[in-house]
């Protein structure tokens, strides 16, 4: 399999929408429901990531099969972080190392090009130990849970854990 990883572009929007909708109904997947994957949502995070963060796509055989993004909030006190990190891999390509490769490339770009970024943040469901271990293997630290923050249905909630990665070359110039 030949995986190409490049920066996201506005022209990728429709393919990214389809990718997100394709995986939105996977149990323990992304937090958004299928009907919340809108043009406005994807356009919004692509704009934010392009202007104040980073978004990458993974392409196999001219098809976008993965996407990762995070961005800096438009708040002075948070200028050192990327947050709302989301990563998706097409269900037909999961388990093939694509998620790890695109995530590692993302972190490499932060270390080499975005050295003003000290911290990257994400949430994952506490009970999804596979994801927790995956993020820990990339260097993320579990900063604790937020009890019952995720609404599932009346009287059914889930606890996400907040995880952070710290840039080992923060503010170092070559």
Task: Label each residue range with its predicted role.
Residues 24-44:
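Conserved GNAT-fold acetyl-CoA-binding loop/helix
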Residues 89, 95-109, 133-137:
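Conserved acetyl-CoA-binding loop-helix of GNAT-fold acetyltransferases
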């Amino acid at each position: 399999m030949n995986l190409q990883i490049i920066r996201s572009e506005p022209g990728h929007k429709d393919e990214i929408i389809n990718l997100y909708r394709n995986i939105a109904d996977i149990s323990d997947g992304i937090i958004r429901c299928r009907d919340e994957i809108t043009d406005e949502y994807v356009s919004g995070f692509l704009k934010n990531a392009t202007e104040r963060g980073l978004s990458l796509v993974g392409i196999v055989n001219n098809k976008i099969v993965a996407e990762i993004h995070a961005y800096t909030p438009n708040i002075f006190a948070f200028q050192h972080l990327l947050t709302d990190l989301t990563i998706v891999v097409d269900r037909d390509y999961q388990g093939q190392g694509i998620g790890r490769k695109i995530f590692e490339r993302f972190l490499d770009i932060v270390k080499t090009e975005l050295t003003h970024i000290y911290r990257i943040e994400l949430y994952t469901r506490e009970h999804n130990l596979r994801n927790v271990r995956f993020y820990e293997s990339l260097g993320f630290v579990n900063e604790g849970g937020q009890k019952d923050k995720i609404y599932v249905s009346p009287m059914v909630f889930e606890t996400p854990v907040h995880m952070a990665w710290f840039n080992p070359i923060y503010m170092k110039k070559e």
